[in-house]
Design a protein with these regions (language model features):
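Acidic/His- and Gly-rich active-site-bordering loop/insert found
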Residues: 3-134
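Conserved acidic functional residues
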Residues: 81, 143-144
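A short glycine/serine-rich beta->alpha loop
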Residues: 133-143
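Single conserved hydrophobic/aromatic residue that forms the stacking wall/gate
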Residues: 145-149, 153-155
Length: 155
């Protein structure tokens, strides 16, 4: 069974790493600071039991989670990127956690009058009753997280 608090802490540690991309770079990843997250992810994959964990020259992190059944099953891959847009800062991310979202406006930043409202983003209502992780209005972070109860792996 998943430990919700550990997942939340892990996610928050990821979003606090500045991974802002550089549009003028001709390398992949476009900044050295993106390697920090790649290395962290690789270490954590090893810690939860994945094998063949590696980071290639482009900072792609790969690993294998061995099957836990005897019969042949299809393989699955999860692919994502960890750079963030240079259009807004990725430094000093200050996530806000909204437990048991009530379907009302979420004040991201009272001082700047930044509000996330289902009046403008009606898909927010799909997440009523769930935990939301949002920006404080000063960075790009806006993630809706839904923690389910998969059977593997134990995190």
């Amino acid at each position: 069974m998943l430990d919700r608090q550990r997942i939340l802490e892990r996610f928050l540690s990821y979003v606090k790493i500045d991974t802002e991309s550089d549009p003028n770079s001709d390398t992949t990843p476009s900044t050295d600071k993106q390697w920090k997250l790649a290395n962290k992810l690789a270490k954590e994959l090893e810690a939860i039991g994945l094998s063949e964990v590696r980071i290639d020259d482009n900072a792609y992190v790969m690993g294998t989670l061995p099957s836990n059944v005897k019969h042949k099953v299809p393989a699955i891959g999860f692919i994502s990127h960890f750079d963030t847009s240079p259009d807004f800062t990725a430094a000093n991310v200050n996530p806000q956690i909204v437990e048991n979202y009530d379907g009302k406006d979420i004040v991201l930043n009272a001082e700047e009058n930044i509000v996330l409202s289902p009046n403008y983003f009606d898909d927010l209502l799909l997440y009523k009753g769930q935990t939301l992780i949002t920006t404080d209005g000063t960075t790009l972070l806006l993630s809706l997280i839904h923690i389910s109860e998969p059977t593997r792996p134990s995190l």
